[in-house]
């Protein structure tokens, strides 16, 4: 595997870093976190103008046609900046339409989504369920040519600002439901992460025409799930990188007993462990992203490896960073708690570390291996 970024990939990284640094300064992130909407509409429009809404979506449907490596680059920078944005949920919805939608559905929903004119969000987890990824309990009852949906989805990312949802039913199908449709109720849910809002979506006799049920079957969404895991793992890696850099800067600047605290092994060894976990997470993420583009048969294992490791690194590194900072790190006024909370929230989304380690164990025992070029 060639680990260096191409010139185009480096340009994406530099552009994303500079834009997010300017747009989402600490003060602005705090303002957004305290707002009712929880995201920056103007910032979203600028992201759409940069082509991010359709970065990994097919060119024929208005996207940029780039791959999972470019997607990972972008989401690592999103995590580094702790950007409050519906980009992740929108990207996952777009990928689902790209992989499993009909041409008519792609024209109606995917093209404006890729342009940033519409926002979609996957509605997967059923309220009161065991929260096992890829298992759904909501029944889609046949009604004429369409179906009727009754049930409640929980922990739906960015639901309050989405124009439509892709609702998963027990047969693995996805159904397009507009947020303003009759029988749809969206309510905010509590989350430790104020920079990414979650909501419940209640469906009470919601009628879905045949034209709004995606033709794809359950297995058609596996590539979408795995890419979502890679993107989220990349975001957690960016969180870890930012926490590491904050800690190193503080360890160099903070004086205790006439010396920078970084001169003491208790601090320097902790920073070394943070570096180790961040770099290992990054290696796993880009190995999985490479597999998605070049060796898709290895993607399920590689994606679970990346998500398992990054799920831990995304909160462990900020947690260690708080320890390096001492008392100031525990205060609301310091930014580290935002990174810790996003890392914790990310660790539980799209399967936690335990679930993904079980998938890795199953794959290894079945004789599967990591990407051949990794």
Where are the predicted features?
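Helix-loop "lid/cap" segments that line or gate small-molecule binding pockets
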Residues: 92-101
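A short core secondary-structure module
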Residues: 123, 150-187
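A generic structural signal for well-ordered coil/turn residues at beta-strand boundaries
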Residues: 93, 118, 134-136, 161-163, ...
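Structural signature of FAD isoalloxazine-binding scaffolds in flavoprotein oxidoreductases
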Residues: 65-74, 132-136, 178, 207-208, ...
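Flexible, small-/acidic-enriched active-site or ligand-binding loops
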Residues: 135-137, 155-156, 179-213
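A short, Trp-centered hydrophobic/proline-enriched beta-strand micro-motif
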Residues: 116-127, 167
């Amino acid at each position: 595997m060639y680990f260096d970024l191409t010139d185009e990939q480096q340009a994406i990284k530099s552009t994303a870093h500079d834009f997010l640094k300017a747009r989402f300064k600490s003060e602005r992130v705090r303002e957004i976190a305290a707002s009712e909407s929880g995201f920056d509409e103007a910032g979203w429009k600028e992201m759409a103008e940069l082509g991010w809404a359709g970065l990994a979506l097919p060119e024929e449907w208005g996207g940029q046609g780039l791959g999972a490596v470019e997607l990972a680059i972008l989401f690592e920078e999103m995590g580094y900046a702790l950007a409050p944005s519906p980009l992740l949920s929108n990207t996952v919805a777009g990928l689902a339409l790209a992989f499993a939608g009909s041409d008519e559905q792609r024209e109606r929903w995917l093209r404006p989504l890729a342009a940033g004119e519409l926002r979609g969000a996957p509605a997967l987890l059923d309220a009161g369920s065991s929260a096992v990824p890829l298992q759904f309990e909501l029944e889609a009852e046949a009604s004429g040519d369409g179906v009727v949906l009754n049930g409640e989805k929980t922990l739906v990312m960015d639901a309050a600002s989405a124009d439509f949802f892709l609702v998963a039913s027990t047969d693995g199908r996805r159904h397009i439901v507009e947020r303003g449709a009759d029988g749809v109720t969206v309510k905010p849910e509590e989350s430790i992460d104020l920079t990414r809002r979650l909501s419940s979506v209640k469906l009470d006799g919601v009628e879905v025409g045949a034209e709004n049920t995606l033709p794809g079957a359950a297995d058609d969404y596996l590539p979408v799930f795995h890419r979502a895991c890679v993107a989220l793992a990349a975001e957690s890696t960016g969180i870890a990188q930012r926490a590491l850099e904050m800690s190193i800067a503080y360890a160099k600047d903070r004086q205790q007993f006439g010396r920078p605290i970084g001169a003491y092994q208790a601090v320097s060894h902790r920073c070394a462990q943070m570096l180790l976990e961040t770099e290992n997470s990054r290696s796993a993420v880009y190995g999985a992203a490479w597999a998605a583009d070049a060796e898709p048969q290895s993607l399920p294992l590689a994606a679970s490896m990346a998500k398992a490791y990054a799920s831990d690194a995304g909160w462990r590194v900020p947690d260690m960073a708080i320890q390096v900072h001492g008392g100031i790190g525990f205060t609301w006024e310091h930014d580290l708690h935002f990174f810790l909370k996003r890392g914790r929230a990310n660790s539980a989304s799209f399967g936690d570390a335990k679930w993904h380690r079980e998938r890795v164990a199953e794959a290894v025992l079945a004789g599967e291996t990591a990407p051949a070029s990794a």
